[in-house]
Amino acid sequence: GTTGLRIADRLKERSDVKLIEIDPEFRKDSSARAECINKSDVTFLCLPDVAAKEAVGLVTNKRVKIIDASTAHRTADGWTYGLPELSKDKLSEVCSAKRVAVPGCHAGGFVTLVYPLVKCGIVPASVVLSVFSLTGYSGGGKKMIAEYESKEKSVLLSAPRQYGLNQQHKHLKEMTAVCGLKNSPVFSPIVCDFYSGMEVTVPLDRSL
């Protein structure tokens, strides 16, 4: 989707990187995909979770580095959470790892704020936090982008919209696990009428 297109656009500008392209006719052919993956140095997966897991299963070349933008491997054993800002050693860990899971958009903002506070003991791991996260509509994929950029766009889309308020959002698992929290935060994701960008707010009580 949009993530893959952005990565490709940025890499095309680099003279030190050669992109391996699959014939569009064979993009869903597992043999053709496996060939491309295994002759690469680095493969980015910008796929739904199930498809990402299937793609990882195609890897036979141990030298291939997989960077997965889906939620499939963010808390999985054997995968490095790709947020170098977490510690002074994290950058080298991400660089050397053969399996890197890209943080979710909401989760990345939350983890960046909360992880150091828990790590330093300022916020106890047992606390139940709340988080409000505003995001642009591009994160919703092609369908949502089309809705927001349509000439017949509903007036209702001009205001921020909450969604996923049942505490089942796919980013909650990594928010909790990476920060070492014992309880999932109460999460309010909100999509807004701008293309991309994030604003993440985590209120803290003075008694902490």
What name fits each language-model region?
Residues 140-208:
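Charged docking surfaces used in two-component/phosphorelay signaling
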